[in-house]
């Protein structure tokens, strides 16, 4: 099984993932916990300070992919994805 350190090393190779400030907190077979370091550039509404949905969707997508890697040993491309937002994500690291 792939380790948290191995996943983090692979993630940090991509400039977008570097920009997201990703840190792998835990990996188990079929599951993973990833933290993204808060950035002011994620704010979509300066008055309300909530996070742009595209950032959240990107985190859902990459986390799901790495959960599959932890189970199967290989990633697969996302063919279709839908995200239902239940509330706004406010400033602070996202896990």
Predicted features along the sequence, with ranges:
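Terminal targeting signals and extreme-terminal segments of soluble enzymes
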Residues: 1-95
């Amino acid at each position: 099984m792939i380790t948290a350190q191995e996943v983090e090393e692979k993630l940090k190779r991509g400039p977008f993932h570097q920009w997201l400030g990703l840190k792998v907190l835990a990996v188990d077979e079929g599951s993973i916990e990833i933290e993204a370091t808060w950035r002011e550039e994620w704010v979509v509404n300066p008055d309300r300070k909530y996070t742009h949905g595209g950032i959240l969707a990107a985190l859902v997508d990459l986390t799901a992919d790495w959960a599959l890697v932890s189970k199967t040993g290989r990633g697969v491309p996302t063919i279709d994805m839908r995200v239902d937002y239940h509330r706004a994500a406010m400033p602070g690291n996202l896990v």
